[in-house]
Amino acid sequence: MYLAMNEKANKQWAIKEVRKDGIRDFEVVKQGLIVETDMLKKLRHPSLPSIIDVIEDEDTFLIVMDYIEGNPLSSALEEFGAQPQELVISWAKQLCDVLGYLHSQNPPIIYRDMKPANVMLKPDGNVTLIDFGTAREFKEKNLADTTCLGTVGYAAPEQFG
């Protein structure tokens, strides 16, 4: 992951680099990243990262996205323990709002890896939901809805169908 500065726009971007030489099954990983970025490119919500560009060649895959200033909720919990109720309620409302937005898409998007490490706490008090690697568009009567994915201990109960 790199931090880049677009000097013309005076904006910071994060660049995620995936190299063929660092991954055993590069094509499978690359296809997963293409699905993830194509999904995120269509979405516009203040609690979601924006994809700026995708650059690929045969050996490297780059995703240019908004830089999200802040730290994961998991870091705040490790460092400071339980958080004040007012903050937790605010974060929960924001997460419910972004999940409602994802579910309102046509077809609905199912986010399947909700956990503190995937919630970025920004300095302004807002949150951003990250890591859409296991998210997918809902498909009617798809048995994959009960496939256990995500992080054990945080997985949705319907995955244990």
Model regions: which residues?
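Conserved short submotifs of the Hanks-type protein kinase catalytic core
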Residues: 58-72
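AlphaC helix of the eukaryotic protein kinase fold
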Residues: 22-42
